């Protein structure tokens, strides 16, 4: 049987933790599966902070954002470790942490298409049901992809 590829978009919320727990509980006993944990972050703009006094004040904010990105990368690797502790072999788990060029839904759709994922595990906010069907990431992904199993954890 061919190896199944599962994508777990992760953005450090409590709902993402629920999706992570679902993946561990449901898929960790399978040997023919790989899990990719994915996070696309907003890149920090390139600004010459020494040019003027106004842009010089941005240096602290840009430094904070750079630090936050590094912390998120470390946290994503901790998610990988949780998957391994949950029963996946190390060779079954990958991380993708990259700057985004589109909205989150577009990044997920492009990654699924380029890397041929079989399953995606998403979550949705506990908000009005109309948001689920109107403008959410889950809705955009569901409407855009074909021949992919999508699990929604709420």
Identify the function of each model-found stretch.
Residues 2-61:
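Small/aliphatic-rich secondary-structure junction motif
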Residues 81-119, 139:
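Structural beta-alpha unit
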Residues 58-74:
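A short acidic, glycine-rich active-site loop
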Residues 142-154:
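Short, flexible loop segments at boundaries between secondary-structure elements
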Residues 22, 71-79, 107:
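Short, solvent-exposed amphipathic alpha-helices that sit
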Residues 119-140, 144:
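Glycine-rich, Arg-bearing micro-motifs that act as flexible, cationic patches
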């Amino acid at each position: 049987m061919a190896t199944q590829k599962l994508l777990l978009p992760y953005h450090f919320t409590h709902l993402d933790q629920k999706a992570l727990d679902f993946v561990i509980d449901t898929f960790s006993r399978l040997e023919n599966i790989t899990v990719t944990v994915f996070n696309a972050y907003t890149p920090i703009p390139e600004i010459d902070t020494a040019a003027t006094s106004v842009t010089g004040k941005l240096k602290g904010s840009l430094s904070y954002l750079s630090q936050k990105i590094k912390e998120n990368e470390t946290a994503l690797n901790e998610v990988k470790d949780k998957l391994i502790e949950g029963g996946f072999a190390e060779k079954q788990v990958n991380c993708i942490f990259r700057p985004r060029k589109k909205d989150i839904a577009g990044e997920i759709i492009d990654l699924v298409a380029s890397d041929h994922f079989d399953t995606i595990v998403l979550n949705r906010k506990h908000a009005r049901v109309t948001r689920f069907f109107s403008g959410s990431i889950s809705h955009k992904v569901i409407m855009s992809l074909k021949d992919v199993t999508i699990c929604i954890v709420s």
